[in-house]
Every structure is written in structure tokens, then in C-alpha cells.
Curated annotation (Swiss-Prot):
Biased composition (Low complexity): 333-342
Protein name: Dehydrogenase/reductase SDR family member 13
Compositionally biased residues, Polar residues: 343-367
Domain of life: Eukaryota
Keywords from the named record: NAD, NADP, Oxidoreductase, Secreted, Signal
Cellular compartments annotated: Secreted
Binding-site residues, substrate: S170
Gene Ontology annotations for the cellular component aspect, listed alphabetically: extracellular region
GO molecular function annotations of the record: oxidoreductase activity
Gene from which the chain derives: Dhrs13
Ranges of compositional bias, category Acidic residues: 316-328
Binding annotation for NAD(+): S46, I48, Y197, K201, S232
């Protein structure tokens, strides 16, 4: 009996340690009122993204839910309007696997929204599922799509400075090892998926690092945020069906709820005084050191150039006229590199009308062009 009690006590003690070190998340403070500000949150129809959007809506922000599924995105926007009491929550279609969809979203957003104060890259995948593409789907969704979207929306972020870009990464970046000779090769099998996921999270951290360098002095700051171990759809979605009922109770005990996972991204989006820490990696609402591979500035620059090519950005744009304003290409052009053709981008929910010319002033004295993508 004594041994049984001792074992129970040890288990309880171990759980308390796990709870306070992993499960319990610090609460985000930051700016109290966000009235008059606009925030885009990708992948905001569930999990961490939805909880992030809810907190932003409660603080009065105009929140754009950028999601792939129209049905789930519109349902989430309705739920958030009801729960927050804020009618300024809308849905816009965005499929990060499709470069054409990213361009369409940017065009629709820039033509309808006069402000962009915070861009939160929350959407991501951990597995290719049953999809078999001719490119690295994990890198496309988790890094290349967000990279392109950031470039297309940077002029609006700059015009609304001080503004922020938050990239939701992961501690999995520590396992990442980028192979630039095979950066966009297809991913096959669960072992390749594990590596590709870690590589994409490393790419997130390197992107934040290089973006901070590119944006220095513009008033736009950026941060990589690790939400912690979270009991979200990203964790459960790709598990075998028979395993989910077994792991759900365990996940509830040892993983954070999505609300807890939203705290560090919210901290990076809202906390005042962290501007000098632009480009850094945050976990549990404070700066944390990254792996040696994530501190490699040469790798960050090389990834930047490689991603521009993968995103369809003109390789010679550095030599273009710096006074010429960038414009997204016609989003109706099909993409040979994309997943299935994106649906037409629409806005669901209350929206502003935007009169006058769009502010597309150049960010870094370099013109960004988007190539026409060839018809398959």
C-alpha cells in the first residue's frame, strides 16, 4: 500500500511539474484597446489562430480571418462576432499552397482595407496527408506562401507603421537542417514529413531574422513565436483514426489548450517595448535562444533568395527602378506550381470601402515583381 501511495505521489508530482512548465501558459498583456487597427490572422478558423483572433476582436480590432475553407472560415467569423461582441470580424479566402491564391488575397485585401497594423502567420500543416504534389507542400504552406504574402502586404504595413509581422514557428526548428539542393523536392513518407516540418519551422525563424534586417528603420518589426505544446487540430489531424481516441485524453492532460497556445503570438503582436527585439524568437512570452542553424545569417540570406524564386518573385528586381511602385500581378493567372486552382477571393462579413489610390510605396528601395505563372 505504501509503495502504491508513493507511486501515486510521484506521478502527481511529475504531472505538476509538467503542468507548470509545459501546460500552463503565461497570460499576454500588451495593448488594451485595438480600436481603429486591422489585423490579419491566417488559419484562424480553429485552434490557436481562432483563439488569437478572438482576443484581438475582444480588444476592438478589425480582424480578417484568412482561411482556406470558406465554410469553416465564415462559421468562425460568425462565432467570433457573437463571442466578442465585435462585428468587425470578416473572412477572406486564402490557400497558402497556391501562389495564385496568395496573390488574389493580397489584391482583394489591398483594394478593400485601408489599414494593416499586424500580420500574424498562424496557418500551417504538419503533414501532407494523402496529397501528393510535385513540390514540398510543407515548405510551401508553412514558409513560401507566408513569405510571398508578407512581400505583397509590406507596403500597407509600412504605411501604417509602427506595425508588426508575427510568424508562428515551433521548437521543432531545432531539428531542422536546410538542404538548399533539395529545398522544394516532394515529401514522401512520415520520416520525410517529420524532417520537412522541422525544416519549415527553421525557415520561419530564419525568415523572421532576415526580415528584421531588411525592415530595420522602417517602423515594421517582426517576431517568430513558439506557441508551446498545444492540443490543437494540427496535433490530432494527421494521426491514424484508431489512435485519436487514445491520445485525446492524454493530450488534454499534458498539452496546452489553444487559448494558452495563443498567448505568445499575442504577446509578439501586442506587447509594447519589444521593438528592439525585432527578428528574435519568443516562447512563453519571452525571448529564447534558437539553435545554431537558426542564427546563421548567411543561411538566412540564402534562404531569402531561394524563397523569392520559389514564390515567383522576379530574380532581377534589385536592378529595377526604385521609384516605381510594386503591384501584385493579376490573380486570375493560373499557377503551375500551385495546388488545385484557388476559389475566387471574397469577403464575408462587415467591410470597409476603400476610396482613392492604394498606398503601394516601395519598402526597401527595390521593386518587387510577381511573375505571370504559366498555364499548365
Amino acid at each position: 500500500m505504501e509503495m502504491l501511495l508513493l507511486g501515486a505521489g510521484l506521478l502527481l508530482g511529475a504531472y505538476v511539474l509538467v503542468y507548470y512548465n509545459l501546460v500552463k501558459a503565461p497570460s499576454c498583456g500588451g495593448i488594451g484597446s485595438l480600436r481603429g487597427r486591422t489585423v490579419v490572422v491566417t488559419g484562424a478558423n480553429s485552434g490557436i489562430g481562432k483563439m488569437t483572433a478572438l482576443e484581438l476582436a475582444r480588444r476592438g480590432a478589425r480582424v480578417v480571418l484568412a482561411c482556406r475553407s470558406r465554410e469553416r472560415g465564415e462559421a468562425a467569423a460568425f462565432d467570433l462576432r457573437q463571442e466578442s461582441g465585435n462585428n468587425e470580424v470578416i473572412f477572406m479566402a486564402l490557400d497558402l499552397a497556391s501562389l495564385a491564391s496568395v496573390q488574389a488575397f493580397a489584391t482583394a485585401f489591398l483594394s478593400s482595407e485601408p489599414r494593416l497594423d499586424v500580420l500574424i502567420h498562424n496557418a500551417g500543416i504538419s503533414s501532407c496527408g494523402r496529397t501528393r504534389e510535385t513540390f514540398n507542400l510543407l515548405l510551401r504552406v508553412n514558409h513560401v506562401g507566408p513569405f510571398l504574402l508578407t512581400h505583397l502586404l509590406l507596403p500597407r504595413l509600412r504605411s501604417c507603421a509602427p506595425s508588426r509581422v508575427v510568424i508562428v514557428s515551433s521548437a521543432a526548428h531545432r531539428r531542422g537542417r536546410l538542404d538548399f539542393t533539395r529545398l522544394d523536392c516532394p515529401v514522401v513518407g512520415w520520416q520525410q514529413e517529420l524532417r520537412a516540418y522541422a525544416d519549415s519551422k527553421l525557415a520561419n525563424v530564419l525568415f523572421a531574422r532576415e526580415l528584421a534586417t531588411q525592415l530595420e528603420g522602417t517602423g515594421v518589426t517582426c517576431y517568430a513565436a513558439h506557441p508551446g505544446p498545444v492540443n490543437s487540430e494540427l496535433f490530432l489531424r494527421h494521426l491514424p483514426g484508431w489512435l485519436r481516441p487514445i491520445l485525446r485524453p492524454l493530450a488534454w492532460l499534458v498539452l496546452r489548450a489553444p487559448q494558452g497556445g495563443a498567448q505568445t503570438p499575442l504577446y509578439c503582436a501586442l506587447q509594447e517595448g519589444i521593438e528592439p527585439l525585432s527578428g528574435r524568437y519568443f516562447a512563453n512570452c519571452h525571448v529564447e535562444e534558437v539553435s545554431p542553424a537558426a542564427r546563421d545569417d548567411q543561411a538566412a540570406q540564402r534562404l531569402w533568395k531561394a524563397t523569392k524564386k520559389l514564390a515567383g518573385l522576379a530574380p532581377g528586381d534589385d536592378d529595377d527602378d526604385p521609384d516605381e511602385e510594386p503591384e501584385p500581378e493579376d490573380p486570375r493567372a493560373p499557377s503551375s506550381q500551385s495546388a488545385p486552382s484557388p476559389e475566387k477571393t471574397t469577403v464575408s462579413g462587415p467591410s470597409h470601402s476603400y476610396q482613392g489610390s492604394q498606398d503601394l510605396s516601395k519598402l526597401t528601395q527595390r521593386r518587387i515583381q510577381v511573375k505571370d505563372e504559366p498555364t499548365p
